[in-house]
Each structure stands twice: as structure tokens, then as C-alpha cells.
Amino acid sequence: MERQFRFKAGDRVKIRKDEPTPFAGLEGTIAAIEPHPREVAVLDRYIVVFKWGEKQSFYEAQLTEADTDHA
């Protein structure tokens, strides 16, 4: 059975505002997913690309769906 991920490549996401990162509150796009080798979903990494081209890696719990009213 194929694993289901919360987000997929191309999805718009927002970094949670309560995360201790300089990217908190910013929106980006999922560029890729790096599944955990032992299929531990909470440890999957999501590669997010920001509008200025920078890529950063986040865990699923650090992300929420982006606001779609201004997309």
C-alpha cells in the first residue's frame, strides 16, 4: 500500500507561527518530500521553497495549509 502524506509537491503551506525558526509565519510551496526510512510519518521531511528561491526542510507538524484567499 502506498503511503499517504499530508501534503504533496506543489501544495502551498505556511510555517507555523509558534515554531522557533526565522521562517515562522511565512508561506512557501512543497518542492519535495523525504520519507523517513522506517516510515515514521511524524519524521517525514517536507522541502519547502520560498518565493525568493530558498529551500528549507520541515517536519509535518511544523506546517499548516496556506491561506488560499490571497493565492
For each feature predicted by the language model, list its residue ranges:
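Basic/aromatic-rich interaction segments and small domains that mediate binding to polyanionic partners
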Residues: 2-70
